[in-house]
UniProtKB/Swiss-Prot annotation:
Residues linked to a glycan: T1
Further comment found in the protein's record: Negative results: does not inhibit voltage-gated potassium channels rKv1.1/KCNA1, rKv1.2/KCNA2, rKv1.3/KCNA3, rKv1.4/KCNA4, rKv1.5/KCNA5 rKv1.6/KCNA6, Shaker IR (with inactivation domain removed), rKv2.1/KCNB1, hKv3.1/KCNC1, rKv4.3/KCND3 and hERG.
Cysteine-cysteine disulfides: C7-C19, C10-C25
Membrane found in the keyword field: no
Heme is among the record's keywords: no
Superkingdom: Eukaryota
Coiled coil location: none
Keywords: Disulfide bond, Glycoprotein, Nematocyst, Secreted, Toxin
Protein name: U-homostoxin-Hdu1a
Subcellular location field: Secreted; Nematocyst
Any one of the GO CC terms: nematocyst
Homology family: Belongs to the sea anemone BBH family.
Example of a GO MF term: toxin activity
């Protein structure tokens, strides 16, 4: 499940393996 702005691939997972919010949406990290 992707949570947050869908402008980039999921870079972070919670302990359940779900996408977590990516506040650097649209930026290279």
């Amino acid at each position: 499940t992707i949570i947050g702005a869908p402008c980039r691939k999921c870079e972070h997972l919670d302990r359940s393996g779900n996408c977590v919010r990516d506040w650097s949406c649209g930026q290279e990290v």
